[in-house]
């Protein structure tokens, strides 16, 4: 009877060891995925920052052109 119990216990221990090994592999895969996603997020944030800077530059240029046009329109009104 005790041999049978030991065999059952051994099987359960082996199953637990196998489960732990599988979970460790899954954790490693998730860590790699997390690292890739973090890198992608950083790249996206950098790209977003560049786009925001370009948009601000375009707004500044537009404001400058509008000011110049208003100045020219003002001079045209003075001439009339």
From Swiss-Prot:
It comes from the Bacteria. The keyword RNA-binding does not apply. It is found in: Cytoplasm. Pfam families: ZapB. Keywords: Cell cycle, Cell division, Coiled coil, Cytoplasm, Septation. One of its GO terms (cellular component) is cytoplasm. GO terms for biological process: division septum assembly; FtsZ-dependent cytokinesis. Its main location: cytoplasm. Residues 49-62 have a biased composition (Basic and acidic residues). Residues 3-80 form a coiled coil. Residues 41-62 are annotated as: Disordered. Signal peptide: none annotated. Homodimer. The ends of the coiled-coil dimer bind to each other, forming polymers. Interacts with FtsZ. Non-essential, abundant cell division factor that is required for proper Z-ring formation. It is recruited early to the divisome by direct interaction with FtsZ, stimulating Z-ring assembly and thereby promoting cell division earlier in the cell cycle. Its recruitment to the Z-ring requires functional FtsA or ZipA. Belongs to the ZapB family. This is Cell division protein ZapB.
